[in-house]
């Protein structure tokens, strides 16, 4: 972009003449920080919501998927972007409404997410027939439906809080797989998933995503990939590296892999089909309720 001016340098307490490099928006910088600068890789940035981002060497137009945007990360490639409005926020909702007081009494609040993983791990894949629709704040992809609502169905007297939590983990994973299926239908096939954000701390949640999607998941040494991606932009901008792919090869390090467990494929496939059907079965009811309330789910 240029160099830091004397006035800006004075305001910031820096030296005039420092190179100023243009970066990018947070999610796109995360793609760079995860080394998702090659076809068939998908970046999954998991926080309160989840962004799903990929690069294609040709434009792909897919209903419910944002883009294609040419040149936003690499000049000769197109970004495809999907997303879920509620993922980590649903887990936080469960924590705040079902567990907060109990864990405060035990003085274990700082470890509550580890405890939640242990709780959910007690339940078998498929949550004994319990399903969660993750549209707690509407559906971003692939339906673009702000009137959609969340749902918990299949409850019986044998189900517990742990079942509901496990079903939330699985329901959000079904939502991610729905986006992957939408992309695949229109010509983009993800072969690897790279994750960042607070949600990447839950190995159980990531394992469920890998099992449902039947795709390996990779973790990197830097949890906040957007920050690393911005540093990579700067490194290329000042000439340390000749290109973004060259820089990511040197600066992004893989810290772990999570591979799909094939024994869970059939059971998750069955419940995924019910997940997709549930939206269409409930769509009119969700819209009527949202319209009657006169509001869309809070963002």
Predicted features, each with a name:
Residues 2-299:
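Active-site core segments that coordinate phosphate-bearing ligands/cofactors
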């Amino acid at each position: 972009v240029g160099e830091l001016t004397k006035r800006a340098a004075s305001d910031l307490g820096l030296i005039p003449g420092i190179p100023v490099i243009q970066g990018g928006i947070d999610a796109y910088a995360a793609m760079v920080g995860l080394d998702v600068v090659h076809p068939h890789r998908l970046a999954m940035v998991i926080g309160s919501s989840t962004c799903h981002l990929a690069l294609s060497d040709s434009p792909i137009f897919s209903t419910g998927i944002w883009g294609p945007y040419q040149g936003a990360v690499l000049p000769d490639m197109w970004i495809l972007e999907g997303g879920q409005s509620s993922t980590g926020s649903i887990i936080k909702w469960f924590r705040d409404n079902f567990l907060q007081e109990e864990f405060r009494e035990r003085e274990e609040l700082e470890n509550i997410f580890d405890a939640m993983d242990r709780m959910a791990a007690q339940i078998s894949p498929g949550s004994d027939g319990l399903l969660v629709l993750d549209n707690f704040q509407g559906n971003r992809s692939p339906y673009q439906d702000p009137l959609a609502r969340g749902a918990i169905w299949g409850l019986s007297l044998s189900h517990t809080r742990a079942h509901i939590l496990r079903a939330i983990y699985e329901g959000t994973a079904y939502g991610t797989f729905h986006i992957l299926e939408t992309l695949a239908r229109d010509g983009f096939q993800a072969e690897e998933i790279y994750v960042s954000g607070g949600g990447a701390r839950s190995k159980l949640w990531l394992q469920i995503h890998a099992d449902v999607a039947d795709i390996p998941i990779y973790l990197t040494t830097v949890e906040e990939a957007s920050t690393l991606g911005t540093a990579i932009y700067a490194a290329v901008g000042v000439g340390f590296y000749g290109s973004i792919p060259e820089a990511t090869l040197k600066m992004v390090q893989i810290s772990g892999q999570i591979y799909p467990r094939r024994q869970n494929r059939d059971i998750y496939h069955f419940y995924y089909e019910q997940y997709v059907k549930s939206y269409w079965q409930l769509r009119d009811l969700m819209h009527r309720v949202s319209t009657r309330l006169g509001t869309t789910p809070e963002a």
